[in-house]
UniProtKB/Swiss-Prot annotation:
Residues 240-307 form the RRM domain. One of its GO terms (molecular function) is RNA binding. CDD domains: LARP_5 (cd08036), RRM_LARP5 (cd12706). The gene is LARP4B. Its main location: cytoplasm. Keywords: Acetylation, Cytoplasm, Methylation, Phosphoprotein, RNA-binding, Translation regulation. Residues 31-47 have a biased composition (Low complexity). Interacts with PABPC1. Interacts with RACK1. Associates with polysomes via the 40S ribosomal subunit. GO terms for biological process: positive regulation of 3'-UTR-mediated mRNA stabilization; positive regulation of translation. This is La-related protein 4B. The modification Phosphothreonine is found at T518, T566, T732. Stimulates mRNA translation. The modification N6-acetyllysine is found at K724. It comes from Homo sapiens.
Length: 738
């Protein structure tokens, strides 16, 4: 039992040493390099009671760079010596611990007892020194903290005093726009505003302490309630008023050279007969001011008018509360109409950020803004871009003016396409001369044959006009070339509806498109022809029947039996002079005079190509807008509907007007049968009012004329095609000439 107790006694001092070394090492916050190497060499201690030694191993590995102190090294020596003892004891005990008898314990006891006794004096001294020294360090640090705490209590007050003095100094107020903006008319700043400054809050948040410090500052003035503070007015300048500039400086200075007066710094003339005398301090200025008012009183026979002026802060103290400075007035002297506001940029054609011109409001500028197509095409909401292309929205300067080649995506591209093309015919002469603008195959190819050419070979095609011609319809992308119509990246939306919409447009503008190229405008001398130029031809009725059977089969299908045409032949001959008498009043009927002029005799046949050429030239020069021509032809129908005797004559005039000029290259073939053409058309037209309705003769004459002249004699057109044209014309109401 005694041996076991002795072994426990030996193990306990070793454990205490290790534990004290561990604590001392923690107190110094410094790792011991030797500890790591030696603790790694310790074998596992499963049978030793002092197993707490292994707890140092993970802590030793975490420690960083070695920082050695004298106390740490001495403690480390003691701890390492204790560890060496323990390691030696375990190494000696290792083979003996396996014995079954108690000799091993006795040997270990004999070997272990002397070592602690021998190592105790040196090791325990080192271990005793370590903790005692380490314990003194926190005491010193605590005393140091206690000693510095009163300093910190005094320092914040002094630092706060200096900081507040600087914040409210004239040097800082000259540049601190925030404090200036918080000043009232008396230059008072709320103390709470000063206390909320960052560098003041770091020092103290006690408002009472800040007010106390501010009251102790000589350069600032706190109001009676302790709520506001302002810098002291440095009243050190005495102002003398109503002293002329011509007064010598010496005389003014002599006023302040008394024995009881302080010395002034400067004496100078200011403005408006005011003199400034500057003193060093406010007390000196007050003393001089009192001297002048009480003792001198007069100067140059006048009472002295003296004031004390505060030294101005180098700022404008009447700024608005928001802290913004007013602009320099000198800017307006150089730039009279310059504005101080900032507008969002409106991108002109020279700038490359165009999309914002749609988003920003309209600025009615002279130069149109434009859209860059590469920037418009990826725009996700293309309906927003087309939001400005409503037919009812017509801005004065549209941002989509130059988008003629690059229109954005539209649900019905042909809608905007035709909106520009068709109405511009009313403004631009000859726009409809080229049928290729409208890709209408039914109009361009009549029965497989191209419609007669309506312009000179050298005449330029007036398709793309000046953008100013589209000023009324700037809301849409505009007409596009056929090539760019297909290659344009943005024209993909709703192509399926384009053909159906085009057919509707075809119905609306068929008459204007087909009639406008055909009616010629002969020269003005043709208006002066009398009735004698068109005598009735007696033998025309017999020859007419065979010609109409071959050339006017379309008319015979609609009109009916040829008997009625034969019966009305004489009546048409009789009404012809009446028709001609009204000719000069109708612009569209002017061509009939030229046609009748060469009808009576074959002697005029050699001149027919020249006359036709002349008519074509005047047709290209004197062409009116298509709407005017259409109304002229429709006025013929309206007037014809009024009186039944005149109606065939006006319809015949309109038919002859539409037939003769386009077929001028083919006219010599037709003129081989003289004296038959003029009356034949009359006979055919006279029977129409009784058989058919009154309006379609103008349309029937217009598209049917080239078809009858260009078709071979035996051909017969399909009745459904012609009936379709007539049904379309019914939907177009007649217009008055005015």
């Amino acid at each position: 039992m005694t041996s076991d107790q002795d072994a426990k006694v030996v193990a306990e001092p070793q454990t205490q040493r290790v534990q004290e070394g561990k604590d001392s090492a923690h107190l110094m916050n410094g790792p011991i390099s030797q500890t790591t190497s030696q603790t790694s060499s310790i074998p596992p201690l499963s049978q030793v009671p002092a197993t707490k030694v292994s707890e140092l191993n993970p802590n030793a590995e975490v420690w960083g760079a070695p920082v050695l102190h004298l106390e740490a090294s001495s403690a480390a020596d003691g701890v390492s010596a204790a560890w060496e003892e323990v390691a030696g004891h375990h190494a000696d005990r290792g083979p003996q611990g396996s014995d079954a008898n108690g000799d091993g314990d006795q040997g270990h006891e004999n070997a272990a007892l002397p070592d602690p006794q021998e190592s105790d004096p040196a090791d325990m001294n080192a271990l005793a020194l370590g903790p005692s020294e380490y314990d003194s360090l926190p005491e010193n640090s605590e005393t140091g903290g206690n000693e510095s705490q009163p300093d910190s209590q005094e320092d914040p007050r002094e630092v706060l005093k200096k900081t507040l003095e600087f914040c409210l100094s004239r040097e800082n107020l000259a540049s601190d726009m925030y404090l200036i903006s918080q000043m009232d008319s008396d230059q008072y700043v709320p103390i709470t505003t000063v206390a909320n400054l960052d560098h003041i809050k770091k020092l103290s948040t006690d408002v009472d302490l800040i007010v106390e410090v501010l009251r102790s500052l000589p350069l600032v003035q706190v109001d009676e309630k302790g709520e506001k503070v302002r810098p002291n007015q440095n009243r050190c300048i005495v102002i003398l008023r109503e002293i002329s500039e011509s007064t010598p400086v010496e005389e003014v200075e002599a006023l302040f050279k008394g024995d009881n007066l302080p010395k002034f710094i400067n004496c100078e003339f200011a403005y408006n007969d005011n003199w400034f005398i500057t003193f060093e301090t406010e007390a000196d200025a007050q003393q001089a001011y009192k001297y002048l008012r009480e003792e001198v009183k007069t100067f140059q026979g006048k009472p002295i008018k003296a004031r004390i002026k505060a030294k101005a802060i180098a700022i404008n103290t009447f700024l608005p509360k928001n802290g913004f400075r007013p602009l320099d007035v000198s800017l307006y002297a150089q730039q009279r109409y310059a504005t101080s506001f900032y507008f969002p940029p409106m991108y002109s054609p020279q700038q490359q950020f165009p999309l914002y011109s749609l988003i920003t409001p309209q600025t009615w500028s002279a130069t149109h803004s434009y859209l860059d197509p590469p920037l418009v095409t990826p725009f996700p909401n293309t309906g927003f871009i087309n939001g400005f292309t409503s037919p009812a929205f017509k801005p004065a300067a549209s941002p989509l003016t130059s988008l003629r080649q690059y229109p954005p995506r539209s649900r019905n591209p042909s809608k905007s396409h035709l909106r520009h093309a068709i109405p511009s015919a009313e403004r631009g002469p000859g726009l409809l001369e080229s049928p290729s603008i409208f890709n209408f195959t039914a109009d361009r190819l009549i029965n497989g044959v191209r419609s007669p050419q309506t312009r000179q070979a050298g005449q330029t095609r007036t398709r793309i006009q000046n953008p100013s011609a589209y000023a009324k319809r700037e809301a849409g992308p505009g007409r596009v070339e056929p090539g760019s119509l297909e290659s344009s990246p943005g024209l993909g939306r709703g192509r399926k509806n384009s053909f159906g919409y085009r057919k509707k447009r075809e119905e609306k503008f068929t008459s204007s498109q087909t009639q406008s190229p055909t009616p010629p405008k002969p020269p003005s001398p043709s208006f002066e022809l009398g009735l004698s130029s068109f005598p009735p031809l007696p033998g025309a009725a017999g020859n007419l029947k065979t010609e109409d059977l071959f050339e006017n089969r379309l008319s015979s299908l609609i009109i009916g039996p040829s008997k009625e045409r034969t019966l009305s032949a004489d009546a048409s001959v009789n009404t012809l002079p009446v028709v001609v008498s009204r000719e000069p009043s109708v612009p569209a009927s002017c061509a009939v005079s030229a046609t009748y002029e060469r009808s009576p005799s074959p002697a005029h046949l050699p001149d027919d190509p020249k006359v036709a050429e002349k008519q074509r030239e005047t047709h290209s020069v004197d062409r009116l807008p298509s709407a005017l021509t259409a109304t002229a032809c429709k006025s013929v129908q309206v007037n014809g509907a009024a009186t039944e005797l005149r109606k065939p004559s006006y319809a015949e005039i309109c038919q002859r007007t539409s037939k003769e000029p386009p077929s001028s290259p083919l006219q010599p073939q037709k003129e081989q049968k003289p004296n038959t053409v003029g009356c034949g058309k009359e006979e055919k037209k006279l029977a129409e009012p009784a058989e058919r309705y009154r309006e379609p003769p103008a349309l029937k004459s217009t598209p049917g004329a080239p078809r009858d002249q260009r078709r071979p004699a035996g051909g017969r057109p399909s009745p459904s095609a012609m009936g379709k044209r007539l049904s379309r014309e019914q939907s177009t109401p007649p217009k008055s000439p005015q």
